Amino acid sequence: MKASEVIANLQRRFPNEPEYIQAVSQVLGTIEEEYNKHPEFEKANLIERLCIPDRIIQFRVSWVDDKGNVQTNMGYRVQHNNAIGPYKGGLRYHKSVNLGILKFLAFEQTFKNSLTTLPMGLSLIHI
């Protein structure tokens, strides 16, 4: 599958995650020409394996606010890629953070870690 096909496929699969799609599109746009020169990359499904997180854990967090009311929020843990080492974690606490943003942050941090030769993958948590 060519890089442009992967992007189109991701847009169909994750239409409500524009931050994630934008990050993947930008990275794939910069490597597409070189990627297309190597049919072995396509045979190994390299781009999809790199772009789609290894796992996403979704969970509920219930808590009591200052007025004594029970609130419920959703939490997410995105374990993006552990190809070069164990998952490295990070936390985000803000009402504006969503799964698409976490996938975007995890995707980009995976590249930062690999480019700086840090022997770790990436995982982010949002509550």
What are these regions (language model features)?
Residues K2:
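Glycine-rich phosphate/ribose-binding loops and adjacent secondary-structure elements
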Residues F111-G121:
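Short, flexible active-site-proximal loops enriched in glycine and acidic residues
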Residues H126-I127:
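Conserved small/polar residues in nucleotide/adenosyl-binding loops
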Residues I21, K37-A44, T117:
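Flexible, glycine/charged-enriched surface loops at secondary-structure junctions
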Residues E40-N69:
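Structured beta-strand/loop patches that form or line metal/cofactor-binding pockets in enzymes
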